[in-house]
Regions:
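A residue-level detector for the "anchor" residue at the start of short, highly conserved motifs
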Residues: 1-239
């Protein structure tokens, strides 16, 4: 169930999380909205000066109410996304951060950077050199080390398909696809080895339909599915 409570770090921060297979929409004090994917947790900390969100794990879509005097900051992994009024998707999976801009502008900087000049739309001469500014349709991908790259033409419909109860994979590494599928089902999938985790998976699946996903892997790749007593399924390379 969705829970909202004071986080242990500070009484000012509200903590929300969704369970496996559960999605919810939060409406914040300024009418900004956060759509939480399954198995997702966020901290929400609003102050008179800033709107601060930490994505602890999972995925969320942010529809930010405009407030030029109060930047909206979302920290995930090693990155912070700064917005004034916009819509964007942020995902944290396997220590990688994915930021997809749907409309407006955002600036992406290293987590913990509270430089007040780091806001979208300012003169680029005022921005630190490591700040990336995104335009609609772009996706930033940052690895565990913080190194990032920008995809200039991301497929917004595919990336946000989770909001419609679908997962749309296009040559997705199986390891990442498994992490995403596991948000929606208590049948936990595990890649048997790195070679299996690197397989490129394509297709559209209903969220939570783990059996159909495993069946597709068996048909197209000939993998072996080992079913454990605890309900998990280990995906092994073809025999």
């Amino acid at each position: 169930a969705l829970r909202g409570a004071s986080a242990p770090e500070t009484k000012l921060t509200q903590y929300y999380e969704t369970d496996i297979g559960e999605t919810r929409v939060l409406t914040l004090a300024d009418n900004s909205k956060i759509s939480l994917d399954a198995k997702t947790a966020v901290d929400v900390d609003y102050t008179p000066q800033l709107r601060l969100i930490e994505l602890r794990h999972g995925q969320a879509f942010f529809d930010v109410a405009k407030d030029p005097t109060r930047p909206f900051r979302v920290t995930a992994g090693g990155k912070t996304v700064v917005a004034l009024g916009t819509a964007f998707n942020v995902e944290l999976v396997n220590d990688e951060v994915f930021v997809t801009l749907v409309e407006g502008k955002v600036a992406v900087t290293d987590a913990g950077d509270r430089n007040e000049k780091v806001v979208p739309g300012v003169d680029k001469a005022d921005l630190p050199p490591d700040v990336r500014e995104l335009t609609p349709g772009q996706r930033l991908v940052a690895d565990a080390s913080g190194a990032s790259s920008v995809e200039p033409r991301a497929d917004i419909s595919k990336i946000t398909a989770w909001r419609r109860g679908k997962l749309n994979f296009e040559d997705e590494p199986l390891g990442l696809a498994i992490e995403r599928m596991n948000r929606y089902s208590r049948i936990s999938l595990v890649a048997g080895d790195e070679k299996v985790a690197a397989l490129g998976v394509s297709g559209v699946f209903d969220t939570g339909d783990t059996e159909a996903f495993v069946e597709a892997l068996q048909v197209y790749f000939g993998v072996r599915a080992e079913r454990r007593a605890d309900g998990s399924i280990i995906i092994h390379a073809p025999a």
